[in-house]
Amino acid sequence: MHNLLALWQQRTRRERCLLLGMAVVLLIGLVYYTLWQPWQNREAQWRQTLAREQASLQWMRQQTPLIRQLRNQKPPTAPEEPSTVIMREAARHGLTIVRLQPQGSRLSLTVQPADFQALMAWLDALGQAGMTTATLAVTAVAQQPGWVTVNTLVLERSDEK
């Protein structure tokens, strides 16, 4: 500290004024770039976020009557025929239905040998469509690992049990 004071006193009055002016400019620049500018940038981001959130809130308020209206509507009352659902999902999962025979509220099916994973995915899709598996018996196909022959498959609608 003593060395800095000695250096300061060795300078002429003009050099001291220039050094003080440079220190003030440096201090102003430092305050501007470390405090003021980041604050302004954050404030602009906050304003944008606030505007976006207010727009979202306004949109949500506009959608409230529509949501209430849709909530009060009843779902369509014409469910698909079970055979239509079964055939559509079988085609989607790559299975071939050989025979589909109604037995009261149940359906007996004959399916060509198929990949076990595809069969399970198909039965899961039918379950999501409201069909349950009443009876299922399969045997492995000896020449094709992962393939099964469906010996017995009886399906029924979940709401008709």
UniProtKB/Swiss-Prot annotation:
Q: Report how it sits in the membrane.
A: Single-pass membrane protein
Which regions span the lipid bilayer?
17-36
Query: Keyword set for this entry?
Result: Cell inner membrane, Cell membrane, Membrane, Protein transport, Transmembrane, Transmembrane helix, Transport
Family annotation (Gene3D superfamilies) = General secretion pathway protein M, EpsM
Q: Fetch the Pfam families from UniProt.
A: T2SSM
Periplasmic face residues: 37-161
GO annotation terms (biological process): protein secretion by the type II secretion system
What SUPFAM superfamilies does the record tag this protein with? General secretion pathway protein M, EpsM
| Residues in the Cytoplasmic compartment per record | 1-16
Cited function: Inner membrane component of the type II secretion system required for the energy-dependent secretion of extracellular factors such as proteases and toxins from the periplasm. Plays a role in the complex assembly and recruits PulL resulting in a stable complex in the inner membrane. Provides thus a link between the energy-providing PulE protein in the cytoplasm and the rest of the T2SS machinery.
SUBUNIT field? Type II secretion system is composed of four main components: the outer membrane complex, the inner membrane complex, the cytoplasmic secretion ATPase and the periplasm-spanning pseudopilus. Forms homodimers. Interacts with PulL/GspL. Interacts with PulE/GspE and PulF/GspF.
Q: Family per UniProt?
A: Belongs to the GSP M family.
Q: What is this protein called?
A: Type II secretion system protein M
Source species of the chain: Klebsiella pneumoniae
UniProt lineage: Bacteria, Pseudomonadati, Pseudomonadota, Gammaproteobacteria, Enterobacterales
